[in-house]
């Protein structure tokens, strides 16, 4: 049976993803900031290596838009470096990685459907 690690499992989207995985009887382990900080590369490697998931669904993100303006370094640590840490950990054990983001990474382009290869132009992190 496939083993899936879900980061950001206590978040709005994470709870729904965990519920959907459980309904499909997927062996899923949800983690959140209480378990480890995705910005801490050593902690990410330790968790991912110990869990040895076949796939990682990376939902952990710094989502407080107001605080992101006053705490840009924390936002970058979680959203950019945290994602890089998850990519590196997945590569190290040969796990598949699914990254969730939002259309905001493409900038202000109303009524446009974007593809996976479209250039990003985020106004924020």
Annotate each PLM feature.
Residues 2-23:
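N-terminal Rossmann NAD(P)H-binding glycine-rich loop of SDR-like oxidoreductase domains
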Residues 7, 31, 56-60, 97-103:
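SDR active-site strand-loop-helix element
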Residues 14, 65-66, 106-109:
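Glycine/Thr-rich phosphate-binding loops of Rossmann-like dinucleotide-binding domains
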Residues 22-46:
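Adenosine-cofactor binding site in Rossmann-like domains, unifying the SAM/SAH pocket
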Residues 24, 51, 92-93:
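Helix C-cap/helix->beta junction micro-motif
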Residues 41-78, 89:
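NAD(P)H-binding glycine-rich loop region in Rossmannoid oxidoreductase-like domains
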Residues 70, 77-85, 92, 96, ...:
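Catalytic helix-loop patch of NAD(P)-dependent Rossmann-fold dehydrogenases
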């Amino acid at each position: 049976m496939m083993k899936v690690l879900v980061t950001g499992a206590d978040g709005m989207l994470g709870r729904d993803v965990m519920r959907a995985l459980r309904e499909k009887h997927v062996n899923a382990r949800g983690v959140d900031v209480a378990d480890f900080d995705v910005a801490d590369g050593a902690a990410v490697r330790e968790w991912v290596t110990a869990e040895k998931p076949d796939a990682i669904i990376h939902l952990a993100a710094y989502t407080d838009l107001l605080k992101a303006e006053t705490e840009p370094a924390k936002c970058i640590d979680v959203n950019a470096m945290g994602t890089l840490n998850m990519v590196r950990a997945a590569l190290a054990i040969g796990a598949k990685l699914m990254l969730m983001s939002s259309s905001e990474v493409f900038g202000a382009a109303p009524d446009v459907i974007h593809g996976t290869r479209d250039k990003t132009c985020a106004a924020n992190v």
